[in-house]
């Protein structure tokens, strides 16, 4: 019978470290290597740090500043069973501004924001947050990254954000 020996240029399987960003279907060099792929499913504003409503019944703009009266923190939320450095994967793939925790501290100032005459403004303090979904990957015998089961999800804050919306004042007359 025939005897098959491994090709001289075959590489041993290697551990690429805890976070190895990959794209399913793209070429990989070493079958058996593992990694992860991750996508942002949605990004939204979470305004749970505080809100203030201020009306300007004057004839000129009204500068408004508010103080944070209670510390509010947004922490990350990840699915169970993640056995690699998820934060590294997200920072490599998208942005280093994603963190595991961001806070507003007591005494911090929000503003100033100018409220136009005859307008009511609602200021909401919070965070820009993204929901992520990902999957573990493996380099297949065809030298392409493929899904390897092990899906995961995460929600992480990207940045603190103040949302300001205005409307016409109510006419109480």
What label would you give each PLM region?
Residues 62-114:
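Membrane-insertion modules used to breach or fuse lipid bilayers
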Residues 11-69, 103-173:
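Core pore-forming/fusogenic effector modules of secreted, proteolytically activated toxins
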Residues 1-12:
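Secretory targeting and sorting signals
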């Amino acid at each position: 019978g025939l005897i098959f020996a491994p090709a001289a240029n075959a590489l041993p399987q290697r551990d690429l470290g805890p976070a190895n960003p990959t794209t399913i279907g793209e070429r990989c060099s070493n079958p058996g290597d593992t990694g992860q792929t991750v996508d942002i499913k949605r990004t939204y504003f979470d305004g749970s740090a505080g809100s203030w409503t201020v009306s300007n019944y004057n004839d000129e703009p009204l500068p408004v500043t508010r103080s944070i009266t209670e510390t509010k923190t947004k922490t990350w939320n990840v699915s169970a069973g993640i056995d690699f450095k998820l934060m590294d994967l997200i920072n490599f793939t998208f942005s280093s501004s994603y963190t595991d925790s961001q806070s507003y501290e007591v005494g911090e100032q929000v503003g100033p924001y100018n409220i136009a005459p005859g307008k009511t403004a609602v200021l909401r303090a919070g965070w820009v947050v993204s929901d992520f979904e990902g999957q573990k990957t493996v380099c297949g015998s065809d030298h392409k990254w493929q899904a390897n089961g092990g899906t995961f999800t995460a929600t992480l804050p990207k940045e603190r954000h103040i949302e300001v919306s205005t409307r016409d004042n109510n006419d109480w007359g």
